[in-house]
Amino acid sequence: MLKIAEHEFHSRLFTGTGKFSSSKTMLAAIRGSESELVTMAMKRLDLKTGSDDILSPLLHSGVKLLPNTAGARNAKEAIFVAELAREVLNTNWIKLEIHPDPKYLMPDPIETLEAARELCEKGYVVLPYIHADPVLCRRLEEVGCAAVMPLGSPIGSNQGLATEPFLKIIIEQANVPVIVDAGIGAPSQALRAMELGADAVLVNTAIASSADPIAMGQCFAQAVQTGRAAYLAGLGQVSQQAINTSPLTGFLNDQ
């Protein structure tokens, strides 16, 4: 069981809502993935009605909705979006995303830390999307973030865990859940993140852009479960040289 703030999750696979061909496919894929936490960009909402074509189905699906601040370019804009989410969706949970560069969508560490500090002071449950920077993760933890969400590689790139050496450090040091977010493009990559000891992964593009999103959601669910089980079982140590798997009895010397 994964606990973030006061909420418990059975599934350690979190999903997104973008890039699906239809809301029907999206909902079916989410069900197939067994995900219990789904993130959605506030910029997709019609501010006049407080809705879009996927919000109502999501609210009725039983998943926990995690609004995000995608599109915010600085702390001020992100805080505004978080306050809007609390008013419209009646939630104090927010996925904090600040990426001023629209080409590479790299998260701004300075603005993210500033926004996180203020939002935590206002009582939000803040889950910041950030570079895989162990120092920044520690600072975000210190200001009160409920979890940290370091990237595996650029958003939507499907490049996998390009930041693995830094993810290992973050996981080792963290006192809050570590959710690997962005760039996970295959179930094997999600499995690897869980083997490292990540508490959860967030996957969107790899599922939504699949030829069969429903089946792919199921594949990711199985991969995350297997990776977590492998981590708990304890992986064998990696060696640079061969190690005998059978005892040396010397029986050949007796011939």
Curated annotation (Swiss-Prot):
What enzyme class is recorded for this protein?
Answer: transferase
**What are the entry keywords?**
Cytoplasm, Schiff base, Thiamine biosynthesis, Transferase
Database matches in SUPFAM superfamilies: ThiG-like
Q: Please classify the protein's predominant subcellular localization into one broad category.
A: cytoplasm
What's a single GO CC term here? cytoplasm
Q: Superkingdom, according to UniProt?
A: Bacteria
BP GO annotations:
thiamine diphosphate biosynthetic process
PANTHER family cross-referenced by the UniProt entry:
THIAZOLE SYNTHASE (PTHR34266:SF2)
Q: How does it assemble?
A: Homotetramer. Forms heterodimers with either ThiH or ThiS.
Q: Per its record, how is this protein called by name?
A: Thiazole synthase
Q: What is the lineage of its organism?
A: Bacteria, Pseudomonadati, Pseudomonadota, Gammaproteobacteria, Alteromonadales
Q: Which gene encodes it?
A: thiG
